[in-house]
Amino acid sequence: VTSYTLSDVVPLKDVVPEWVRIGFSATPGAEYAAHEVLSWSFHSELSGTSSKQ
């Protein structure tokens, strides 16, 4: 069994709207394969506030 790790930091604030849903998809082509997400993390920060007066 071969194991692979994928890790990346992606600044999404400039490319996605305020509310999003995240999903995973993978395929080896025409053959069957099982994929497992062994860990997942997500971090979000509020970078500022606005108030209307």
Swiss-Prot record:
Keyword tags: Lectin, Mannose-binding
PROSITE patterns documented for this protein: LECTIN_LEGUME_ALPHA (PS00308)
A Pfam cross-reference name: Lectin_legB
Extent of the signal sequence: none
Ranges that cross the membrane: none
Entry-linked SUPFAM superfamilies: Concanavalin A-like lectins/glucanases (SSF49899)
GO MF: D-mannose binding
InterPro entries: ConA-like_dom_sf (IPR013320), Lectin_LegA_CS (IPR000985), Legume_lectin_dom (IPR001220)
Alphabetized Gene3D superfamilies for the sequence: 2.60.120.200
Entry's family note: Belongs to the leguminous lectin family.
Subunit structure and binding partners: Heterodimer of an alpha and a beta chain.
Function, in words: This lectin specifically binds mannose and glucose.
Descriptive protein name: Mannose/glucose-specific lectin alpha chain
Organism encoding this protein: Vicia cracca (Bird vetch)
